[in-house]
Amino acid sequence: MLANVGAVPSLPTATLAELFAADPSRAERYVIEVADLRIVLSRQPIDDDIVAGLVQRATDALVAPRRDAMFAGERINVTEDRAVLHTALRLPRDAELVVEGTDLVPEVHEVLDAMGAFADRIRADERITDIVNIGIGGSDLGPAMAAQALDAFRHPRLRGHFVSNIDGADVATTLAGLDPASTLFIVASKTFGTIETLTNARTARAWLVDALGEDAVADHFVAVSTNAERVSGFGIDTANMFGFWDWV
């Protein structure tokens, strides 16, 4: 398909100063506003030919219809025959997204509400000072990125930690500085069978049980998963399991 996509013109040889001098309206013209986003492109080394070429290339590559197919819940993940609807997680409560006869928005907000209520309880529980996310891949990188980006807004009592490496030194180093009584673990695994994640989770569980006893697991572990049976078997209260869907 890409062989049929038109080429993009070469970057202009003019400097930014020359581009602004040649086009006094550049600062106003090269701005895109979408919802709450304002994207300023005027200081990028582009000109009208580049913009037109990029738009044509996107058109040739069927970007718009493929985007619309994704938003509509079509199964564009052809490898696993699944929809790709991470966008549904950001839809407002009053939106509607019906896929194969089911409106996904109420389901999404049911989980978001449960997450919000749980987060409020943790903020109010002065016993908890440290939260350890145990995951790998997207179950580690995504939460770690969000925590880093929003660090200035976190609760001053709560500290976040991330464990993903199956090398035992990673989890051991993290646990060495923590108090079992004030630590909460989040085990993030869709199937609750990911080897790396479960290995680290079992290490953390043993560390907690050794200090506080078996009953403490239900109070100090929560799960992000779709497998209630395995989550319960680990000792986590399924009321503290936050689910998601194959299309995420």
Language model regions located:
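Extended, charge-enriched "interface" segments that sit outside catalytic cores
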Residues: 7-10, 15-125, 129
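Basic/polar N-terminal segments that are highly enriched at the extreme N-terminus
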Residues: 1-7
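Glycine-rich phosphate-binding loops that contact phosphosugars or nucleotide phosphates
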Residues: 116-248
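Preference for short coil/turn "hinge" residues that link or interrupt alpha-helices
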Residues: 4, 12-13, 39, 134, ...
